[in-house]
């Protein structure tokens, strides 16, 4: 069985590395992006099952990247989990996201949220 692909879009290397390690340990295949531009490119090319999207990133922030995902017919159904230290950032655009996680987030909550949005 092929592992479920999770795209992690996070500009801080250490945070991205920790999430990747946690998710790989839980049996997920992790695709990494350091900004919204890379996240869109990876989503188009690799079609992840779910995206964990930081809201504050260089080049293209997570909110803009998620709006772009929702505008593309082949990508709009991919669940997106917003991750931010400032949840008020997504309050006006909550409908774009399948879940919102406050940073920092425990590994258990991250995995549980991914499983919830995937219907597991």
Describe the role of every protein-language-model region:
Residues 46-52:
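Active-site beta3 strand of CheY-like receiver
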Residues 17-25:
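Charged docking surfaces used in two-component/phosphorelay signaling
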């Amino acid at each position: 069985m092929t592992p479920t692909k999770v795209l992690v879009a996070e500009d801080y290397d250490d945070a991205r590395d920790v999430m990747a390690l946690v998710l790989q340990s839980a049996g997920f295949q992790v695709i990494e992006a350091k900004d919204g531009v890379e996240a869109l490119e990876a989503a188009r090319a690799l079609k992840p099952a779910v995206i964990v999207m930081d809201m504050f990133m260089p080049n293209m922030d997570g909110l803009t990247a998620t709006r772009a995902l929702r505008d593309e017919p082949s990508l709009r159904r991919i669940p997106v989990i917003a991750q931010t230290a400032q949840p008020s950032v997504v309050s006006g655009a909550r409908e774009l996201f399948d879940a919102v996680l406050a940073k920092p987030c425990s590994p258990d909550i991250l995995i549980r949220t991914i499983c919830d949005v995937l219907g597991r």
